[in-house]
Amino acid sequence: PITYVTNGIHTCTWLAPNLKELYNKYLPPYWQDNIQVDSTWEKIDNIPDQKLWNAHIERKEKLIKLIKQNVTNRYVNSGIGYDQIAEVVNKLDPNALTIGFARRFATYKRATLLFKDIARLTQILNDPNRPVQFVFAGKAHPADVEGQNLIKRIHEISLMPQFKGKIFILENYNIGISRYLISGVDVWLNNPRRPMEASGTSGQK
């Protein structure tokens, strides 16, 4: 008997168009219908490294552009001047390791776990030789006050002098923003409290 059903994602729905083009060219025909077959992915090494990397960089550049626009709109609506806005968004670095966290802001997902050691985080995010930046997005349930407080906390930390232009939180999270984040970040952050998370589908996309 079936004792459980694990949730998952539909690969082709979330696959970036330029990556799909590469897969269509280098993977076996009808690969979309054989995603679960090992031999399908044995051909992944046929894709030249540079082409695969260029496809990722293309998506990352689109994400950077989206972040700039989203943050600018949010700051303008908050009455923040353009000089201050430019000071923040111009620090976005397409060459930095970009780490993404986007999902429902439930407490067990621990969105603010990395803020437990502010001193260490400050050191990591301000290393000129190994640039790192974080981008957050998501919504909390209207009745989830603690989840809403997580969003508020991230916003407050993003305004701290040492984190300006290093930590971003996007407003009005939706499927469109999700697509940009999933395909554009370098690393997807997933650190839920065990065993509360079902499967972490936000990053599987």
Predicted regions: what they are:
Residues P1-K205:
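Catalytic cores of carbohydrate-active enzymes across secretory and cytosolic contexts
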